[in-house]
Amino acid sequence: DAVDRQMRDRLNGGYAEVLPRPGIREQNPHMHLLEACLSLHKVDPDGGHIARAAELVALFETRFTAGPGGLLGERFAPDWSTPTGRDADIVEPGHQFEWVWLLHAYAAATDTPVLPAAATLYDFACATLDDDGRACVEVTREGEPFDGSRRTWSQTEALKAHLSMLESTGDERHAAAACTSFDVLMDEFLTPDGGWIDHYGAEGDILSTFMPASTTYHVVLAFAELIRVMKA
């Protein structure tokens, strides 16, 4: 209720990312709000959370993916039009994957077909993986690397997307892709003492020795999904 009262943008749609309202809009907070709505719906199915989720999915369809190729943009003008320059051309494979998982979760919660956009985002993001199945940070809308470095969280979102595609289609190719993402995480990012290497450069050099707490969320949820889908 507080989010609706204080942060809802009744003119342009969506919600303010922060208060006071910034001069740019972002899909990322809305993505996490959708995830929260879906989680709330599981424990409070009569609480109206799925209606808010539907509004966010509609925003995804009409605004977030309105740019070339139907890909997920990151930052927008206050009215949700796409800015010029860098923000018009750069997309993040990790977030394409994350929305694939969310769209499958939304379809399951509403007993509706998965939106075709999920396949669009998935196919594009998979095409940007390197030969060993690693996801990089940023690419152009043509799929060319822009920031070829690699973060832990992007690999976890690739794993979740592969698992959601496997669950919805039964295609064993997605199981193989999930195994590849799991191997990347275990062999390169997660350390034996329970930590992780959060950021590699494009050439495999370690860029950061810090372990952001936010990454824990991505790792835990990815492994929870792995256990649920693969019965591992």
Language-model region placement:
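Glycan-recognition and catalytic cores of secretory/periplasmic carbohydrate-active enzymes
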Residues: 1-232
